[in-house]
Amino acid sequence: MPAKEYRKAKTGLAVVTLFMLFAGEAIRNLLGWEIFMGMGVLITAIYIVVIIRARHLIHWRSIPFWLAFFALFAVASVTWAYSPANTALTLWPFIEVTIGGVGIALTLPWNDFIRALGTTLRWVLAASLLFELWVSVFIGHAIYPVWVDTTAGKVPAVYQWSRNLLFEGGPIQGVVGNRNQLGFLAVIAQIVFSIQLAQKTVWRNWGTVWIGLALLTIGLTRSATDIIALAAVAAVTALVLWMRSVPATKRRPVYLTAYAVVIALTVLVKVASSAILAVFGKGSDLTGRTDIWAAVTALAEQRPVFGWGWLSPWVPWLEPFNNLAVRSGVHYLQAHNVWLDVWMQLGYVGVIALAIAMFALLSRSWFIAIDRPQWDLDDTRPYSAGSLLPLLVTVALLAQSFAESQLVVQSGWALVVILSLTVMVPTRITKALT
C-alpha cells in the first residue's frame, strides 16, 4: 500500500476506534452488545498486527514506567481477586483499550492524531444533537436502548437512551446515553476545536461554528462536573499563555501567583461550598455521591493494600458490588470517583501507581506546553497551539476524576495511554508542529 494511502488508513482506523471508545453506548444501544463486542475484538486484532509491524519504534526509555506498572498490576490482580472469573471478564475490555491506545500512539503522527480526534468528536457531537432533535420532533417521548425490555413494567429513567428534553433546555444525553460523558466529550472537543482554529487547520467560520456547538452541548447537558472541568481548562490555558509571555528565567512570580490563586480558591470552596452547590443545583450529598463514596470507602478498608481485584465497571451480579451504589432502585456500577474506585480494586498500591503516572503525564505535558520547541541549539522556534493538547486534556481528565471513574475505562483510559506514550518523546509533538 502506498505511504499516503497507508497513512489515511491509519487515521481512519483511529477515528473508528475513538468513536467506539467515545460513543460505544450508541453502538450497543442501537445494534446490541454482541455486535459491539465483535467490533472490539476485530479492532484489537488489527492493532495487535499494527503494533507488531511497528515494534521497531518501541524503546524501553519511551515507555512510561508507572503507567505500565499500573496496567500490569491491574492484570496481575486476577491472582488475588475476590472473584477471579469476574476480574478476568472486566480485564478484557481494559486490555483491548490499552492495545488500541498503544497502537494509536505508536503509529499515528501527532498532527494526524489531532485530526482524527477532531473528526471523531465532530461526529459524536453532531450525531448527539441530531439524535436529540429527532427524538423531540418525531418521537415525542423518551426512548430506550434495544436491549432494555420495556414490557416488563416501569423501567427507571436512568436506563433511557434519550429523555426527550431538548426543547426543555436539557439535560440531554446524546447518542452516548449519559449527560456527564457527553458533556465531557464536549469539553475535549472545545479543546481540540480551539487548537485547530488557532493552528488554522480548519476554516475560520467552520471552526467557530464547532466551538459554538461544543459550548452549546456542554450547556444542554447541565453537568456541573463538566462545567468545572471546562473552567479548569480555561484557567490553565490562561496560565500557560502567561508563562509563554515571560522569559524562562523570570517565571517564578507567575508560579507563586498561581499557587496563591489555587490556595485562595481552595479556601473559597471550603467556606462557600453550600452556596456553590446551590448554583449548580446540587444538594449536600452531591446527587447521592457522598453515600456511594462512604460505601466504597468501607469496602476498600477491608482490603486496603492490594484491593479486591480489578472490576471496572463493577459487574451487576456480584456481591457486594451489586449493592454498593443504589439510588432510587438503580444499581450504579462505579464509585463516581476514580481514586476511591482504584483504592477499592487495587488498594493503596494501585492508587499510588496511578497518581504517579498521572503526575508524570501532567508535568511532562506542562513543560511541553510552556517551553519553546527545541531539539538542537535553536531556542527561538515559535510556540504552537498544538503543544497545549496533552496538558489541557490531562487537566480535564483530572478534574473529572473526582466525580467520575472514567479515567480508567474506555475513552478516559485510551486518552491517558495515548498521551502518556506521546509525551515520553516530546519531539513527536514539537517537531510535528514546526
Question: Positions of the model-derived regions?
Answer:
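Transmembrane signal-anchor hairpin modules in multi-pass inner-membrane enzymes, especially those
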Residues: M1-A76, D112, P426-T434
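Hydrophobic transmembrane alpha-helices and their immediate junctions
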Residues: L346-V395, A432-L433
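A membrane-periplasm/extracellular boundary helix in multi-pass inner-membrane enzymes
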Residues: L130, W134-I139, T237-S284, A298-Q302, ...
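Transmembrane alpha-helices of multi-pass inner-membrane enzymes
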Residues: P390-T434
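Long extracytoplasmic/lumenal interhelical loops at the membrane interface
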Residues: A275-A294, A298, F306-L346, S365-P373
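Membrane-interfacial entry segments at the cytosolic side of transmembrane helices
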Residues: N111-L121, V202-T208, S245-A260
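Transmembrane alpha-helical segments and their membrane-water interfaces
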Residues: Y82-F138
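Alpha-helical transmembrane segments of multi-pass inner-membrane proteins
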Residues: G118-L241
